Amino acid sequence: MTNSSSTSTSSTTGGSLLLLCEEEESWAGRRIPVSLLYSGLAIGGTLANGMVIYLVSSFRKLQTTSNAFIVNGCAADLSVCALWMPQEAVLGLLPTGSAEPPADWDGAGGSYRLLRGGLLGLGLTVSLLSHCLVALNRYLLITRAPATYQALYQRRHTAGMLALSWALALGLVLLLPPWAPRPGAAPPRVHYPALLAAAALLAQTALLLHCYLGIVRRVRVSVKRVSVLNFHLLHQLPGCAAAAAAFPGAQHAPGPGGAAHPAQAQPLPPALHPRRAQRRLSGLSVLLLCCVFLLATQPLVWVSLASGFSLPVPWGVQAASWLLCCALSALNPLLYTWRNEEFRRSVRSVLPGVGDAAAAAVAATAVPAVSQAQLGTRAAGQHW
């Protein structure tokens, strides 16, 4: 009887992908706060991701290449927030021993566990790939010539990248065994799916850091050029706004036609020099953006490494690492859009009260939006 009960408990643990562990009765009370957190993330993430998808599909000005990758990530995050998180929250609120369908691993209960695990793996994989596509798109926009960018991100090429992200994620979900070892059997000395997940997260982090830190190194001239990135903190930093307002025609980057307009150039005081302000502002925004990714993904890297080598990991560390990674799915829309001027205008047209409140909060420090004509190229806002 003891062995049977232990096997059932272990099966429940493996079925929840180590998110709501039930290895001991003492953990039962701690599953309720975790379930409530998943419920909040599910509601907030579903609304935020759904709003971004609706805005981009409804407003022509938002239908750019960069936003296509953002919407792709929002669609993947929507599957996690709307389909997987509610199930995990409900299973955590059920009494111990009844959090799974009454069946063996090879029966209906096992199929249900694999389906939930596959749904989570598909959504998170596509979401992380979309983050990489957004970072690479912005890096090439800043560091390559407009003609090169336009040739690479043609409409059919962009559609191919989006389809490839889903195909790659689906192939990994179908071909690889579950992240957690199969319950009821002796754990292997090395569990390769967990190690592969850790390696993939490390590779994604390295790519993001390379792209965003490369942007900081390469962009040195114009505040307008940096504003193409739509970093979520750029429009609220006072140094950039003051420099742009006091010296609107000073030292802008030359357009594709050649030289800048020397008649408009004015000497700037050291405190408002655009290069110095731009380096400080872009560096801060990139640093915060990278910190969000590191905080959300690196704890899961270490948990995956420990699980891959069959090392014991405390329940609290497991739950916290998965919650942080899943929270990235709920915060993804805000991470890219909440300081974007075009998104704010679209939100004001859909939700006047919310949009007006957001506009009033940033009115004192907002930088005017930069049109494609001012940039001198369609690459920054290339439509689908």
UniProtKB/Swiss-Prot annotation:
<feature type="glycosylation site" description="N-linked (GlcNAc...) asparagine">
    <location>
        <position position="3"/>
    </location>
</feature>
<dbReference type="GO" id="GO:0005929">
    <property type="term" value="C:cilium"/>
</dbReference>
<dbReference type="Pfam" id="PF00001">
    <property type="entry name" value="7tm_1"/>
</dbReference>
<feature type="topological domain" description="Cytoplasmic">
    <location>
        <begin position="57"/>
        <end position="73"/>
    </location>
</feature>
<dbReference type="GO" id="GO:0060170">
    <property type="term" value="C:ciliary membrane"/>
</dbReference>
<feature type="topological domain" description="Extracellular">
    <location>
        <begin position="1"/>
        <end position="35"/>
    </location>
</feature>
<dbReference type="InterPro" id="IPR017452">
    <property type="entry name" value="GPCR_Rhodpsn_7TM"/>
</dbReference>
<feature type="topological domain" description="Extracellular">
    <location>
        <begin position="95"/>
        <end position="116"/>
    </location>
</feature>
<dbReference type="GO" id="GO:0050885">
    <property type="term" value="P:neuromuscular process controlling balance"/>
</dbReference>
<dbReference type="InterPro" id="IPR000276">
    <property type="entry name" value="GPCR_Rhodpsn"/>
</dbReference>
<dbReference type="GO" id="GO:0007188">
    <property type="term" value="P:adenylate cyclase-modulating G protein-coupled receptor signaling pathway"/>
</dbReference>
<keyword id="KW-0472">Membrane</keyword>
<keyword id="KW-0991">Intellectual disability</keyword>
<feature type="topological domain" description="Extracellular">
    <location>
        <begin position="307"/>
        <end position="310"/>
    </location>
</feature>
<dbReference type="GO" id="GO:0004941">
    <property type="term" value="F:beta2-adrenergic receptor activity"/>
</dbReference>
<feature type="topological domain" description="Cytoplasmic">
    <location>
        <begin position="217"/>
        <end position="285"/>
    </location>
</feature>
<keyword id="KW-0297">G-protein coupled receptor</keyword>
<feature type="transmembrane region" description="Helical; Name=6">
    <location>
        <begin position="286"/>
        <end position="306"/>
    </location>
</feature>
<comment type="function">
    <text>Orphan G protein-coupled receptor implicated in a large repertoire of behavioral responses that engage motor activities, spatial learning, and emotional processing. May play a role in the regulation of cognitive and motor function. Couples with the heterotrimeric G protein complex of the G(i) subfamily, consisting of GNAI1, GNB1 and GNG2, thereby acting through a G(i)-mediated pathway. Plays a role in the attenuation of D1 dopamine receptor (D1R)-mediated cAMP response in ciliated cells. In non-ciliated cells, involved in the inhibition of the beta-2 adrenergic receptor (B2AR) response.</text>
</comment>
<dbReference type="GO" id="GO:0003774">
    <property type="term" value="F:cytoskeletal motor activity"/>
</dbReference>
<keyword id="KW-0325">Glycoprotein</keyword>
<dbReference type="GO" id="GO:0007186">
    <property type="term" value="P:G protein-coupled receptor signaling pathway"/>
</dbReference>
<protein>
    <recommendedName>
        <fullName>G protein-coupled receptor 88</fullName>
    </recommendedName>
</protein>
<dbReference type="GO" id="GO:0007602">
    <property type="term" value="P:phototransduction"/>
</dbReference>
<keyword id="KW-0812">Transmembrane</keyword>
<keyword id="KW-0539">Nucleus</keyword>
<dbReference type="GO" id="GO:0008020">
    <property type="term" value="F:G protein-coupled photoreceptor activity"/>
</dbReference>
<keyword id="KW-0966">Cell projection</keyword>
<feature type="transmembrane region" description="Helical; Name=7">
    <location>
        <begin position="311"/>
        <end position="331"/>
    </location>
</feature>
<dbReference type="GO" id="GO:0005737">
    <property type="term" value="C:cytoplasm"/>
</dbReference>
<feature type="transmembrane region" description="Helical; Name=4">
    <location>
        <begin position="159"/>
        <end position="179"/>
    </location>
</feature>
<dbReference type="GO" id="GO:0005886">
    <property type="term" value="C:plasma membrane"/>
</dbReference>
<feature type="topological domain" description="Extracellular">
    <location>
        <begin position="180"/>
        <end position="195"/>
    </location>
</feature>
<dbReference type="GO" id="GO:0071482">
    <property type="term" value="P:cellular response to light stimulus"/>
</dbReference>
<keyword id="KW-0963">Cytoplasm</keyword>
<feature type="transmembrane region" description="Helical; Name=2">
    <location>
        <begin position="74"/>
        <end position="94"/>
    </location>
</feature>
<keyword id="KW-0807">Transducer</keyword>
<comment type="similarity">
    <text>Belongs to the G-protein coupled receptor 1 family.</text>
</comment>
<feature type="transmembrane region" description="Helical; Name=3">
    <location>
        <begin position="117"/>
        <end position="136"/>
    </location>
</feature>
<feature type="transmembrane region" description="Helical; Name=5">
    <location>
        <begin position="196"/>
        <end position="216"/>
    </location>
</feature>
<feature type="topological domain" description="Cytoplasmic">
    <location>
        <begin position="137"/>
        <end position="158"/>
    </location>
</feature>
<dbReference type="GO" id="GO:0007626">
    <property type="term" value="P:locomotory behavior"/>
</dbReference>
